[in-house]
Amino acid sequence: MSLPSDQPPSRRDFLAGRALRDEIVTVGQAAGDAMLGEANEPRREPTSGATIRLATSAMATDFAVILNEAHRDDPRQPLRWASEALDLIHLLEDQMSVYRPNTELSQLNRAAASRPVQVEERLFELLCRAREIWRETEGCFDPTSGPLIALWRQCRKEVRLPTDLELAERLTLVGMQHVMFPRSLTLRVGSEKLSPDSESQATDVTFDRDGVELNLGSIGKGYALDRAAEILNEQNLTEWLLQGGHSSVIARGSHNGLPGWPVGLRNPLLPQRRLGTILLRDQALATSGTAVQHFRFEGKRYGHIIDPRTGWPTENMLSVTVLAPTAAEADALSTAFFVGGVELAERYCSNHRSVSALLIPPPTGGQRLEPINIGVPEEMLFWNDEDVPRP
């Protein structure tokens, strides 16, 4: 996409960063295009004299570390650190995948309804954080919604909708109130009704019924980026971008003199087009939407993001982008805000000033989109004027 530059920028445009647009698109095109994904295949490696990229495949998607060209003269050490960061993502997949029978999470799901299961400390911390976000988002983010996801996957294969009875049965298994932590952590995770064995280990997890399962698909990719970022930070790398799939990214420092890393925002109506560009610095970003994953039944479109409170796909939003201090938070909250809508997003962001969001509802007419900006600084945003009207 080429952003319009046929008119000289006004002072207002300049203060909003419009005068930087041509430079941002030129220097950051590849890094931004990485977020557009399959619609722009074949993907171009972002190495056009500006970056070095190292990538791997894990968690059914692509992960990449992107470094500035300042490392091009002697990239060996930075690339070793980048490789170490990507290797960790594979180890985390071996721990968290629910599609592999011997991972720690799969073993937890099989056993936790019958006995306490001790889990690795960092995984336990992630589960505690997931429970906090579940509570803070009023159940709109729920890592126990796997039974609903499995039901809808089955219905899609059978070209039908779930019955009311099927949904009701699955909903009895959904909710983090069914996941029990040790008594000593009651206050930290904010639970009111935890009553496990007082002799349980500090990182024990139990389920209160058969059929409950944890699926970290809506937070695990971001968590993997956060853990990979720890390695880069420990080595004092100050300018890099970590990308997980086409929806999650975390960035540090600046990109070749720009005030951040340019990241492309996909148009949810026309996935092959870029809706705009956001400059990301020392933050994480995640986007949730149903532009790619959906199915149709009897003429109606059903997206893949399920409201765990009702069991039905959410229809109120086209896409939601969240900026947060960590990629795990951004991942989880983009899903929660997609489900909970503008009111939840505004309420959450007002209570968590380090979190901001862009929500894109369906257009009232035509294909002109009107994003709802909750706290994202305007100087970070560069919209495609063809798709987003100027205020």
Regions inferred by a protein language model and the residue ranges of each:
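Mature catalytic core of soluble alpha/beta enzymes
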Residues: 1-391
